[in-house]
Amino acid sequence: MTGAQSRGRIETVNGVQLYFQVNGTGEPLVLLHGFSGSSQDWMASTTEWGNKFQLIVPDLRCHGRSGILSKPFRHEEAATDMLALLDHLGVGACKGLGVSGGGNVLLHMATKQPERVKAMVLVSATPYFPAQARTIMTHYADSLPQQQWEVLRHRHPEGDAQIRALLASTKAFATSYDDMNFTPPYLSTIQARTLIVQGDRDPLYPVEISVAMARAIRQSSLWIIPKGGHGPVIGDGWPEFLKTAAAFLREA
């Protein structure tokens, strides 16, 4: 599939309604937002990268315009959706950029069908949920400030019912041990050239997890951001990060 342009559409993929956009020309690149985010998070990036890649930008299941599901979100199921979306679009292999939960989805894609992910950039992703993340996840929905609710309402058009369904998934994450459970031997099956980006002050995932993941993934590089938290490139550092990520992805 080359040279496709799309304003966005909703289609049934893998048995669920998925919203996605396809824009630009070049090698297929899947952009995956984080948990509770949406495809809107990539709006500025799609304008800048449209002449470098064919951008495939979905709302993951349960997110944005992909509607509400009656069961908790699982990264593994979202990865199956994304592989099915590639099939639906006639895309054999792709590159990927995922932030937080989007990076977790890419890990599943790159281990389920290693030959289909040629290169990927993982920002604040994790092979498993450590204890400190589980503690935060348990209480996250109970302490969400009103300002964050307004951000979520902007991202999720189904309103508070959709947001509450998403937030219920954070408690499910806290007790799940089979969704994110990548051992080093399993990570070693990844064929993609991989850039791992991690803040050294991430409250969810200690930097040591990323160091171990980089050792396990054979063709990986690790970019540790000093004093960086979760999603350390978001904010003032985003334009420079996009340049670095684009250069890495175009080389692979």
Language-model features: where?
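Active-site nucleophile elbow and catalytic-triad environment of alpha/beta-hydrolase enzymes
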Residues: S169-Y186
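Acidic catalytic loop of the alpha/beta-hydrolase fold
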Residues: R201-Y205, G231
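Flexible "cap/lid" loop of the alpha/beta hydrolase fold
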Residues: N104-K112, K118-E150
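Active-site loop/oxyanion-hole signature of alpha/beta-hydrolase fold enzymes
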Residues: N23, T47, I56-L97
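Catalytic active-site module of serine/aspartate enzymes centered on a nucleophile-bearing elbow/loop
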Residues: S220-S221, P226-A252
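Short beta-strand/loop motif that positions the catalytic acidic residue
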Residues: I190, I196-Q198
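Conserved HGGG/HGGXW glycine-rich cap/lid loop of the alpha/beta-hydrolase fold
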Residues: V16-G67
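Short alpha-helix in the alpha/beta-hydrolase fold that links the catalytic acid
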Residues: A192, P206-R215
